[in-house]
From Swiss-Prot:
It is found in: Secreted. This is Secreted aspartyl protease 1. It holds the Pfam family Asp. The gene is SAP1. Residues 21-88 form a propeptide. Belongs to the peptidase A1 family. Inhibited by pepstatin A. Its EC number is 3.4.23.-. Keywords: Aspartyl protease, Disulfide bond, Glycoprotein, Hydrolase, Protease, Secreted, Signal. InterPro entries: Aspartic_peptidase_A1, Pepsin-like_dom, PEPTIDASE_A1, Peptidase_aspartic_dom_sf. Disulfide bonds join C321-C352. It comes from Malassezia globosa (strain ATCC MYA-4612 / CBS 7966).
Length: 395
């Protein structure tokens, strides 16, 4: 009999109450922002924006395919699946140097004897690294599973490799036999950051079911005191990933919670943008905010002083930098106003570019809500109670 992840977490939490005094305290991982979508003079690099948009489209396409494979049904928010190139044997030359663009938040981890920075992504569920980063032969605890993985990217190609298990050290915690996918091709073009650690639910993972996402492994092994993690992202320094509990110093006031359905795989919530109801996937792997083009157009056309324009096939908005428009998101009844540094992500022809953009043919009928919002809030991801908590981040 197979138990759901919620049943396992519930059992672990209940069992853990008896030994709470033996559990370590919550731990914090300091995060660094890798690259931005602007040039040195703060001009929007629309080529980089287009690359990230394509990468996100293919990322969600692959995740929705994973969902179908893992559950036997289509995701309730499925819009369409892209015409991907399917290389089932995992062979062939794959040029992925332009994929990812390092637009995530990176922190330190150690698998076996290999230490490196990795991006933490609430919009995916697997841990993958570039070649020549993780060295399994140097680790006595490493095991090659003989299972493979294959992940699609924005140019229609795939990154492939073998899945290993090894001891993981992160933020002072240590877990055994955690799955890591070692790619045979480079898929992140960033010397400092060498991989992605997914923090979504198992329903969207590419790896076989027996290989848990890393945070689920921490929970099952009772390494963390609570099945909770917390992202607080800031412009500049001070961004953190808090594991195993809630750091109240990272936010103002009280957390407001919304329920999530772990069977959907994603951290999805109903919300509002400038009063318009939306479905939102909270994704630390996105630098800006993407939405269905018709919904974004509806929002932009109602914003005072914002002029719609198209670049790279996507809908954007431009405004006078000295007169930033009102842009707010609402979750769990709490509003978050995007400030001057969040409402725009760069400049174009002397004007500021709005930090939301619309795309045609998104794989999901949902908004992908990334950094521009996350820099205003501290967000708690609670796998034990299947909910997300939102509060304004502290100064």
């Amino acid at each position: 009999m197979q138990l759901s992840i919620q049943a396992i977490i519930g059992f672990v939490v209940a069992a853990g109450l008896a030994v709470a005094s033996e559990l370590p305290s919550p731990m914090t991982v300091n995060l660094e922002r890798r690259k931005m979508l602007v040039t040195k003079n703060d001009t929007v690099d629309f080529k980089a924006v287009r690359k990230q948009a394509n990468a996100l489209n293919y990322k969600y396409d692959k995740l929705l395919r994973n969902f179908r494979k893992n559950t036997g049904r289509d995701h309730p928010l499925l819009h369409l699946l892209l015409d991907l190139i399917d290389k089932r044997d995992g062979k062939g030359d794959v040029d992925l140097d332009d994929i990812g663009e390092g637009q995530l938040w990176a922190g330190d981890v150690q698998f076996g004897q290999s230490k490196f920075k990795i991006d933490f992504d609430t919009g995916s569920a697997d841990t993958l690294v570039n070649p020549f980063v993780y060295f399994p032969h140097r680790s006595k605890s490493s095991r090659k599973t003989h299972h493979t993985f294959s992940t699609a990217y924005g140019d229609g190609t795939t990154a492939s490799g073998f899945i290993y298990t090894d001891d993981l050290k992160i933020g002072g915690y240590k877990a055994k036999d955690v799955a890591i996918g070692l790619s045979v091709t480079k898929f992140i073009n960033d010397e400092d950051n060498q991989g992605i650690a997914g923090m979504s639910f198992p329903a969207v993972q590419s790896f076989p079911k027996k290989f848990d996402p890393f945070f689920v492994a921490l929970v099952k092994q009772k390494v963390v005191p609570e099945p909770v993690f917390q992202f607080t992202l800031k412009r500049g320094s001070g961004s953190t990933l808090h594991l195993g509990g809630i750091d109240n110093s990272r936010f103002q006031g009280e957390l407001s919670y919304v329920d999530v359905n772990p069977e959907d795989g994603f951290w999805i919530s109903e919300g509002k943008v400038n009063g318009k109801k939306i479905d939102a996937c909270i994704d630390t792997g996105s630098s800006i905010i993407f939405g269905p083009i018709d919904e974004v157009r509806e929002v932009i056309t109602k914003m005072d002083g914002v002029t719609p324009f198209t670049a790279g096939g996507a809908l954007h908005g431009a405004f006078d930098c000295s007169k930033p428009p009102k842009l707010d998101f609402e979750f769990a009844g709490q509003k978050f106003n995007l400030g001057e540094n969040q409402v725009s992500f760069g400049k174009y022809q002397g004007q500021c570019v709005l930090s939301i953009m619309g795309q045609k043919n998104l794989p999901m009928n949902a908004w992908v809500v990334g950094d521009s919002f996350l820099q205003t809030a501290s967000v708690v991801f609670d796998m034990g109670k299947n909910r997300m908590g939102f509060a304004p981040s502290s100064n």
